[in-house]
């Protein structure tokens, strides 16, 4: 039989130990930034990946809006330029692949060890995405400034900025 002193001891251990267990980090905590030391390559890389996921969703929505805007420039006398719409979509998909490959090279060129090349590559992807978003927003704003009856013939000049490697 457990005496009153031992019962108090067990109760004290439970009262002190349970909150400490709740504060303990899970053993399998590798996919969250808070699981890694602040400033570490893993923490920074995971934070950048979270930022990138959010930015990719925003960019997909903005790009879809741009394609819709370009499609809306048609009229009864001028049909939708299907080739342009297909090119906008294809170029965006190709740009996305290019961005990752370019940034993988950038990360590798740092010469850093451990996880740092991946972290630098992730930062590069974020930078490229932010620049692309600025260009998409700028193209949308440019097209919106063109009077409706002139959009079909003038919108292409606004879209030129989406091909910066060719149009310098």
Per-range role (PLM):
Residues 9-21:
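Sec-dependent N-terminal signal peptides
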Residues 2-10:
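Positively charged n-region of N-terminal signal peptides that target proteins for export
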